[in-house]
């Protein structure tokens, strides 16, 4: 029940909940200033979200909306890789929906748009696209080890094809 209470507080922009969230983020950043470990959790959904933002030319959706859709995509990818359950993905979807956040990319965005734009992400290293995946709820890691078939299936599903 506490997650539902906190969720309601965040969705109504409760000042304490927002302040506490900012403090948690600051603590995570301080614990991992070089983005080598636990800080990856803060980037969950950003590879997909940044592609959405770029596709929309940084208009129509704010950063958090793009990252919201990206977070669900990252969770779905994590499930396809066997790290989190379908039920956990459904829980993430429900939380995002209850906050009125997008859970799918713009309808006009296609698989090739994602692939092209994701190659521009700051996490690309030596030409290898890296994404943040959930190893479990609350635990994330940056990886380049995502089979192309899993990524393509995710993008096709997200883009309605």
Predicted segment positions?
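Internal helical hairpin/lid segments
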Residues: 49, 53-91
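Residue-level signal for inorganic ion chemistry
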Residues: 46, 71, 137
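Oxyanion-binding "anion nests"
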Residues: 13-60
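Short alpha-helical scaffolding segments that buttress acidic/His motifs in well-ordered protein cores
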Residues: 17-25, 71, 96, 118
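Flexible, glycine/charged-enriched surface loops at secondary-structure junctions
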Residues: 13, 33-41, 61, 84-89, ...
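Single conserved hydrophobic/aromatic residue that forms the stacking wall/gate
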Residues: 1-12
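C-terminal charged capping/lid subdomain of soluble metabolic enzymes
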Residues: 83-161
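Short amphipathic alpha-helical interaction patches enriched in hydrophobic/aromatic residues
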Residues: 25-33, 52, 56, 75, ...
């Amino acid at each position: 029940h506490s997650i539902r209470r906190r969720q309601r507080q965040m969705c109504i922009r409760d000042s304490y909940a927002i302040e506490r969230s900012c403090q948690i983020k600051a603590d995570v950043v301080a614990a991992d200033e070089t983005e080598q470990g636990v800080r990856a959790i803060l980037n969950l959904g950003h590879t997909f979200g940044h592609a959405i933002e770029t596709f929309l030319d940084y208009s129509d959706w704010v950063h958090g909306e793009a990252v919201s859709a990206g977070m669900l995509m990252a969770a779905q990818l994590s499930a396809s890789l066997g790290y989190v359950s379908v039920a956990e993905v459904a829980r993430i979807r429900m939380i995002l929906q209850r906050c009125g956040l997008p859970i799918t990319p713009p309808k006009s965005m296609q698989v090739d748009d994602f692939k092209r734009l994701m190659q521009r992400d700051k996490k690309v290293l030596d030409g290898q696209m890296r994404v943040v995946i959930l190893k479990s709820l609350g635990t994330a890691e940056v990886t380049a080890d995502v089979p192309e078939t899993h990524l393509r299936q995710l993008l096709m599903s997200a883009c309605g094809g």
